[in-house]
């Protein structure tokens, strides 16, 4: 269970009163507040008076705290624990104001510290609260739809209508109100700049910025983004996008979509696939929702039936005809195809390549430094116009994540894929940062965690994508350039003493971390107020003796005896070697289960020692504070948290080696346990979704392929015989069942079998790639543990975790191998059946009417005979001897269903009576000279000899000549007339 970050303010005051005469103990006490925080709801006027009265009158930074207590409490108070942070801040202001009204001395020196004295700080805080209350009221009214907000929006909408309905990222609707509120907030943040590092101020700005950004990003009406040049497919995808993600301002789209589909349904049939397995085609799973809503003509419908329906096509050849290239990112199925490289190198991808190049050039290759929130919101509108928001970017990032790093595709296709990944990863991290943005140190921490965590997730060990992440990092730091500069610090601390500057800088360093500037002594600063006693006759032996007596087991710091030695030249080296290294190693050897109770207090005591006795080692202090906060107050140890702790530990080891002059090997017991929690969290949050995606996207294809394999097995077990007249096919299934199928239907079903085999093979191509991506992700997680493993050879937890990861990767590899082998065996056996079917179909194709007319009967019959001879020369197909009865029965049932079920009531081909009248009718009607092989058949009439009079009767030689000339006409001739009947 994580500890509370806030300290008990009343208890802290009591501790100060009890130790008022001991400045070192007083420093320990206030350090609890400075490293943690005080709950703003616990701060009252009387408590503030008691706090000031309990502080020592001199020493360290106590004088600054007593004179500028309003700034000090705002710097270390938190409002995040309150249900309504802004109300809690207003109550805090009221209590601080009450405290100042009863003070005889306003506190602080207005001339020396114009920004930090109590009166100026409280006035600035009050002004900020008033502005934030106004902004949050507007946002709440907008969200709640009050009358005042409605009137304002109506006036804005009216002005927008006068400008027309042309789409794009032009302002309109509620955008003027958004711009006004953003300007108001940015002005308030600029005026509060001297206090932006106060925790209470930073939290309020952080909360308001995030609420404003979220509100502004939901105001995306479809009317602003549609174009007159949009195709039917463009319109359907855009309506679905804006209704799904921005329904609050697009409620009327439901009716508009219904009417549009009703009036354009004929055109829309061109870009949907009605194949029975259309939802199993590459990328189709991402089009299922919009396809269902298009199918029923209702944006509010949800697919809960499990039925089949037409799916919007993801084929490049089809999409090219019906989708505008600049709308490509509204089509997730297309993006999935391009990312998986499920496209032919011959496909026309030039238009999409140009769109990618334009997006990269406009937004990513030469990013402009963003100075205002308004610039960010305008960029959001441009990205929405392209089809990007947080949800779509997350979906596209997941698509890219499950694809293997390299595939056997043409260079052009691979280049498009790499451009897509660069675009997606950039915009994904942009939206991740945007929704937690504020110009404060709180966002600076989040930005670093986002970059660290998503670098591990999205890039990992993929060397070919490292340059992509370098571009992502550059763009994030450019778009969200949040920092507190040395110029700001010098301007705000003008007139402060060195002790005050040191306290303020250390506080900044604990909040901003290593990205902060390095403090330089101020020329005009007043003298330091350090409580160090004089250094008289101190020897190395004295330092060694005092350092050997330090013991932090009780979690208390008693460094009064060491203060006299801290300015000795050899003190940092001896103190680091005998105290810090030892304590550092012992603390990180405490099991995690005991760390809250035992390790955390000792770590806090070590922080205090380093703060007082090694004041110049600010980085060491900051790393210790970071570890303390992350191990004490953070609940979920993910990859970013673990890597931060790990990096801090090894940075501390490097610093201590430099100070002590001896090698330092950190104890990794605690790191190993944190690593185990991080790995478990990573497996749950990154590998599990990949496995679920494999199951979701491939389950249908596997089921269909299993049915297809059973059918092919049934065909291999069966025998087919053509009737004498060629009209019917008789199928025997191991002599047990007899099927009678019209030849035309039989041929059609065989063609369907060949087509389905090709489609299913295409659908299953990505299964192995997805399984490979799971294994690659596990390998990336393993690589995150390598640095700890190098320092912990033989460590039990590390060894167990490495073994578990290897076992997981091995099982995934084994599953991948089993699936691959099973599919290869099935494809091999299915391929043999399909090849045999294709040979049979080749005979029918050779004897088709078109072929006979074009090439003549003699050549076609010769080729067909050759095909039959080659087919008969092949060995008959067999099946494994151990095939079970149940499997054989399932295969036979699949064959019966395949051949019989769809055609139970199918009509037989028409029969023509062979009479003089019908023959004459066929000739006079201009019928083609060569009928279909599987078409209508003559039915010989049983006529008497007298009925044959006046019909075609010639000598045998003449008949032979006429027959041959009619079925193999001379070149240029299309028909042969029968000679007149002889009497």
From Swiss-Prot:
Residues 914-923 have a biased composition (Basic and acidic residues). GO terms for biological process: virion assembly. One of its GO terms (cellular component) is viral tegument. It comes from the Viruses. Residues 902-932 are annotated as: Disordered. Its main location: virion. It is found in: Virion tegument; Host cytoplasm; Host nucleus; Host Golgi apparatus, Host trans-Golgi network. Keywords: Host cytoplasm, Host Golgi apparatus, Host nucleus, Virion, Virion tegument. Residues 474-983 are annotated as: Interaction with large tegument protein. InterPro entries: Herpes_U30 (IPR007611), HSV_ITP (IPR034738). HAMAP family: HSV_ITP. Belongs to the herpesviridae inner tegument protein family. Interacts (via C-terminus) with the large tegument protein/LTP (via N-terminus). Plays an essential role in cytoplasmic secondary envelopment during viral egress. Interacts with the capsid via the large tegument protein/LTP and participates in its transport to the host trans-Golgi network (TGN) where secondary envelopment occurs. Modulates tegumentation and capsid accumulation at the viral assembly complex. This is Inner tegument protein. It comes from Human cytomegalovirus (strain Merlin) (HHV-5).
